[in-house]
A protein has these predicted regions:
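Short N-terminal "domain-start" leader segments
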Residues: 1-24
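Low-complexity, intrinsically disordered short peptide segments enriched in small/polar/basic residues
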Residues: 3, 38-41, 69
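Generic alpha-helical secondary structure signal
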Residues: 8-11, 26, 53, 79
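Intrinsically disordered, low-complexity acidic regions enriched in Pro/Ser/Thr
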Residues: 16, 36, 76-79
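Short loop/turn segments immediately following beta-strands, especially the blade-tip
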Residues: 28-31
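Short, solvent-exposed secondary-structure capping/transition elements
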Residues: 33-36, 67
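A short, exposed loop/beta-hairpin motif centered on an aromatic-Gly-Thr core
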Residues: 35-49, 57-59
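Compositionally biased, intrinsically disordered linkers/stalks adjacent to structured regions
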Residues: 49-79
Length: 79
């Protein structure tokens, strides 16, 4: 079982200052170990609803974790 979740983070950038943004993490469920982080992509968007919609689409389409970076890249290129 794989799940995709949005997480909030605060980043400080030398030119932009401090800002809130959202990333997406991919976790796999392992019996006896629970949910284990597979990978995460940071600073995808500053729009929580957009991040949640993208994570929901990944979940709905049962995206394999190895495709997470490609999907995020496609999303960012389509903005």
């Amino acid at each position: 079982t794989v799940r995709y979740r949005v997480y909030e983070e605060w980043i400080t950038h030398p030119q932009l200052g401090r800002y809130c943004c959202y990333g997406i993490m991919c976790e796999s469920y392992l019996p006896k170990h629970g949910w284990q982080l597979q990978q995460a992509v940071s600073d995808i968007t500053d729009d929580r609803y957009a991040a949640e919609a993208l994570a929901a689409l990944m979940q709905q389409e049962d995206l394999e974790p190895c495709h997470l970076l490609d999907v995020v890249e496609d999303y960012l290129n389509g903005m």
